[in-house]
């Protein structure tokens, strides 16, 4: 009897130990890719796309992510967990994924560059970073692109995509992103040249923000003026920078009752609606921190002008395009704060 009990336990152990791909996907992936891969902030995992990418590519994409883009890496997932996620995603089509050779395809990168500039640069950009803004599918994207062209210079893509897979996509095309088929337009050797050139692409060095504020959660400047004058100075500087100013609020408003609000702590909220479409196109999650604000506080006999470090905040979104905007916004906000406190 004891023997059969041990045998039963041993047979059941793999069942209990096997990772749940559906649960792992819903926990780690569904927020961006939706529950059945419809896409949203992240790319749609459509039948067309899944028919063109291997299980190995999906697994490596999960493992490496897309540095500087919305797609994070998942180093904490075990190999078994990654495999479970891949199997779950693959189950949506009911078909096995393609298997590609791992051998390098030989070509002339110089000739590939000329072909890339002629056939690919319009959508994928001069440096391979992908023309347009944003990643995945967003409501604000121009409808000419259901999916934005891939960032071919991204290290995550370079590590995940085999030469053979890239060759097939070039030849077959991809309807969902308006990528045409180059079968009959490029010879096999010309495709090899393009692939050789793609392997030379590298991501651009990220633009850095002001070193003085690097790593700090907020910009803080002391004003030589009283609270009321400083508030007006900030508003004038914002108006001069083409920002629309929202009705004034106190910092504690909504957090305590109206009789306890500290009226010596003012929150000045502002936005440039002309740029709002552009920003939400880059990353719709940005809506969680909009509108921008500068706070003016009277504290311990001093008047302080404070704003969140937007360059630092932007890095939390894992989106290089947004990080670039964060640096530009940092320059504008610091200029406004400096003008208000001169």
Question: What spans do the regions from the language model cover?
Answer:
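Sec-dependent N-terminal signal peptides
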Residues: 4-13
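Electrostatic cytochrome c docking/interface patches
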Residues: 12-24, 91-115, 131
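The canonical Cys-X-X-Cys-His
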Residues: 24-35, 85, 89, 112, ...
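Extracytoplasmic electron-transfer domains, predominantly the class I c-type cytochrome c fold
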Residues: 36, 40, 45-93, 138-200
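Terminal, regulation- and interaction-focused segments at domain boundaries
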Residues: 207-246, 338
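Ser/Thr-rich, low-complexity intrinsically disordered terminal regions
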Residues: 235-292
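Beta-strand/loop substructures that line and gate deep hydrophobic ligand-binding cavities in soluble
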Residues: 293-319
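Well-ordered alpha/beta subsegment
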Residues: 312, 316-342
């Amino acid at each position: 009897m004891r023997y059969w009990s041990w045998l039963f336990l041993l047979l059941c152990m793999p069942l209990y130990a096997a990772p749940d791909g559906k649960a792992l996907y819903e926990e780690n992936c569904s927020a961006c890719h939706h529950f059945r891969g419809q896409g949203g902030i992240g790319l749609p995992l459509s039948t067309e796309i899944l028919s063109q990418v291997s299980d190995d590519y999906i697994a490596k994409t999960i493992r490496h992510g897309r540095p500087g883009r919305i797609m994070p890496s998942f180093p904490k997932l075990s190999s078994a967990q990654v495999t479970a996620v891949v199997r779950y995603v693959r189950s949506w089509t009911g078909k096995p994924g393609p298997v590609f050779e791992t051998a390098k395809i030989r070509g002339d990168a110089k000739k590939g560059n000329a072909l890339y500039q002629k056939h690919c640069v319009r959508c994928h950009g001069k440096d391979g970073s992908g023309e347009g803004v944003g990643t995945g599918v967003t409501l604000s994207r121009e409808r000419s692109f259901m999916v934005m062209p891939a960032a071919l210079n991204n290290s995550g893509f370079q590590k995940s995509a085999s030469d053979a897979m890239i060759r097939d996509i070039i030849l077959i095309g991809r309807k969902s992103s308006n990528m045409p088929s180059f079968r009959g337009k490029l010879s096999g050797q010309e495709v090899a040249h393009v692939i050789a050139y793609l392997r030379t692409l590298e991501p651009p060095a990220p633009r850095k923000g002001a070193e003085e504020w690097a790593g700090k959660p907020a910009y803080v400047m002391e004003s030589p003026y009283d609270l009321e004058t400083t508030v007006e100075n900030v508003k004038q500087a914002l108006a001069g920078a083409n920002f629309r100013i929202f009705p004034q609020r106190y910092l504690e408003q909504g957090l305590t009752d109206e009789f306890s609000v500290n009226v010596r702590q003012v929150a000045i909220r502002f936005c440039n609606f002309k740029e709002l479409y552009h920003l939400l196109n880059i990353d719709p999650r940005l809506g969680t921190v909009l509108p921008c604000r500068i706070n003016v506080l009277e504290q311990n006999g001093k008047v302080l002008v404070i704003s969140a470090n937007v360059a630092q905040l932007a890095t939390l979104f894992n989106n290089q395009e947004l990080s670039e905007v964060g640096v530009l916004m940092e320059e504008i906000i610091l200029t406004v704060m400096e003008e208000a406190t001169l």
